[in-house]
């Protein structure tokens, strides 16, 4: 059994028990019906859908233990099994050609642990969209990590090309400042040099 919870315009409409499969399902309709002014600032439907799709990919990659299914306009855009395999999620998100061109990597020191996959040079791209890393289960961006990744690939990829990387990083919260940006996407490290070295060595080897 499960629970059906309906909210309209920020107000509770109903809360009732019902039969349901395991998991959580969100159905979102007419998101800006009561704030039409805000909807005017949105980009095209295709662009906004792309943002949502990217978010779902990030969630699936950072939490391979959870099964995700993203349906947009009755079409399945993403489906992951939740079997704890990051490589299986990469296959679901990026396809077979990417998944078969990966090398598994791992690294551990006294304050951080790194696991994940790096791509062979032939699957590098002309932008950084394939550079994904997650700290304590959260998708983030950080200049130190980006530099370490790209320095690690120097001499292996052509100029103006960027590698495929999917790294899961675990570290003590005391070594990490997540309050740099309201969305907590940007982070700072107390031990930047050691973080750089760890990422560089993980990628380079």
What are these regions (language model features)?
Residues 1-205:
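N-terminal phosphate-binding caps/lids of nucleotide- and nucleic-acid-binding domains
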